[in-house]
Amino acid sequence: MKKIFFLSLFLMASLAVMHSKAIDPVEVQTSTAVTEVTFYSPEIVRVVKTPLGKKGNTRKSLVVTLEPQDVKVQKSENASAITIKSTVLTVKIDKKTGLVQFLSKGKNLLKEKSYGFEERTSGPDAGSFRTTIVYQLDKDEPIY
């Protein structure tokens, strides 16, 4: 009987891990776009930007391949920004512009300077968008 109990407990724990999910995405709508932020783990976050009035991306990310976890976050809001914090990473979204900033322990990791969308009108990608994001970098800081 003990073996059946422990086997059942193990199976339930396994199922709970398989079905864990991230918190609901945080969305900020500006005059030109919708910015959606989803934490997949305390140190991994997925950001999706969609032109305002267009259908959002429903495809699975090719970059963030981790299955979403149940991440404990703190959300706060003031007049200019929404802030979402995990135990490792802080994400700030400017409510007016939709620009995103990533911080760790209060120090800037990466900050968007601007973004834009170019609609694809022909070929297999017709109807999708090419997104351009410009980041604020230090003078000698490269991105790989």
Regions flagged by a language model, labelled:
Residues I4-A13:
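Sec-dependent N-terminal signal peptides
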Residues F5, M18-Y144:
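N-terminal accessory segment at the very beginning of proteins
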